[in-house]
């Protein structure tokens, strides 16, 4: 299994604010673009991927929306609006949740009130963690053993204190090249490298 975590530090956890933030300063469209490129292939979807979207602009708890492609039946279409609507639905379902609670949104989709740090701690048990860094090991030279998990951010970089936590959990830095890319572009390159080496 491949896992991808997108930490969206400016994405609101209120569904209406989330939808209103498309194309605005919070750039919530990044979540839909990344989800699209992580899950879908031509005329189908990957069945070996789990995607976690962590939305952190909140008055109570972060929301982590999980898309497990092994169990997803119908996501509503291969376009930005369908994916944004699915995320907004998850946010609506999460209203009133207490800390570290989980609810089912649809088949293969859940929403939880867990933080990025807690999520990554949990994933570190079963996954080899990787974070993007221009100075990291080239993805073409990196050996992948077992289940890789790739940690990405929206347009707001990962805070320094998070890097220290991730290092303690064994996260390794990998590079996709000399340019800073959008998360939605990173996932395409990562999938391509892993597909070639399978």
From Swiss-Prot:
Protein name: Putative pseudouridine methyltransferase
CDD domains on file: TrmY-like
BP GO annotations: tRNA methylation
Gene Ontology MF, one: tRNA methyltransferase activity
PANTHER family, per database record: TRNA (PSEUDOURIDINE(54)-N(1))-METHYLTRANSFERASE (PTHR40703:SF1)
EC number from the UniProt entry: 2.1.1.-
Cell location: Cytoplasm
Family: Belongs to the methyltransferase superfamily. TrmY family.
Cellular component GO terms, alphabetical: cytoplasm
Chief place of localization: cytoplasm
Residue positions binding S-adenosyl-L-methionine: 132, 186
Pfam name, any one: Methyltrn_RNA_2
Record keywords: Cytoplasm, Methyltransferase, S-adenosyl-L-methionine, Transferase
């Amino acid at each position: 299994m491949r896992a991808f975590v997108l930490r969206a530090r400016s994405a609101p956890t209120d569904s209406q604010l989330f939808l209103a933030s498309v194309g605005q300063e919070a750039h919530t469209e990044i979540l839909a673009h990344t989800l699209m490129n992580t899950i879908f292939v031509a005329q189908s979807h990957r069945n070996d991927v789990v995607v976690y979207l962590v939305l952190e602009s909140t008055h109570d708890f972060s929301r982590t929306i999980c898309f497990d492609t092994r169990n997803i039946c119908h996501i509503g279409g291969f376009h930005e609006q369908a994916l944004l609507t699915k995320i907004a639905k998850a946010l609506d379902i999460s209203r009133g949740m207490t800390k570290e609670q989980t609810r089912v949104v649809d088949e293969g989709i859940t929403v939880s009130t867990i933080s990025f740090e807690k999520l990554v701690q949990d994933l570190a048990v079963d996954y080899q963690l990787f974070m993007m860094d221009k100075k990291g090991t080239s993805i073409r030279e990196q050996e992948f053993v077992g289940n890789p998990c790739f940690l990405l951010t929206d347009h707001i970089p990962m805070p320094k204190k998070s890097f220290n936590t991730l290092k303690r959990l064994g996260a390794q830095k990998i590079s996709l090249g000399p340019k800073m890319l959008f998360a939605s572009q990173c996932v395409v390159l990562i999938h391509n490298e892993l597909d070639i080496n399978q």
